[in-house]
Amino acid sequence: MTARLISTTEGQTMVLTLSNPEHRNALGPEMYAAGVEALNAAESNPEIRSVVITGEGGIFSAGGNLQRLLSNRQQAPEVQAQSIEGLHSWIEAIRTFPKPVIAAVEGPAAGAGFSLALACDLIVSASNSVFVMAYTSVALSPDGGGSWSLSRLMPRQLATELL
């Protein structure tokens, strides 16, 4: 899967569009790296005052590409760790970004897509938005800091229910 992260500028805002609608804007290592690179460019550009992350085709993100995740299970632990580190690097870059980062969510934000939205300073959601952790339904544990974020944004009991 190629990066499929489109970076545009609208006024003083950098817009990062997850552009992989045929796979429900699934995330992957190339997209993680492109996201970090785009944030580095936005940080060094004094004309950019904010970043918006959105998805193409009425979908924010279904999270990780399950086919890739399943094939990763056959890889050496180091390869698996490298893939997870890419996501965590992007999440950390969002969390520590010195300018506001806004998730503009339309449709589903699931799994790592939900974690990505939670890393942002603000989530603006359309009336058709759906937020779901989804990890346990595919026998995975939450990644991307989703469990950490949820436990700090809402009561523990509700966060536990969502996880």
Where are these regions (language model features)?
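Conserved CoA-thioester-binding segment of acyl-CoA-metabolizing enzymes
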Residues: M1-E56, E92
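Glycine- (often His-adjacent) and acidic-residue-rich active-site loop
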Residues: R4, G55-A93, A109, S137-A139
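Terminal peptide-recognition signature
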Residues: L16, N20, G35, I53, ...
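Short, glycine/charged-enriched secondary-structure capping and boundary segments
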Residues: E22, E30-M31, N65-L69, L116-A119, ...
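Hydrophobic alpha-helical membrane-association signature
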Residues: M31-A34, S83-G86, L116
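Acidic-histidine catalytic/liganding microenvironments
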Residues: N45, N72, F97-P98
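Crotonase-fold acyl-CoA enzyme core
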Residues: E92-L163
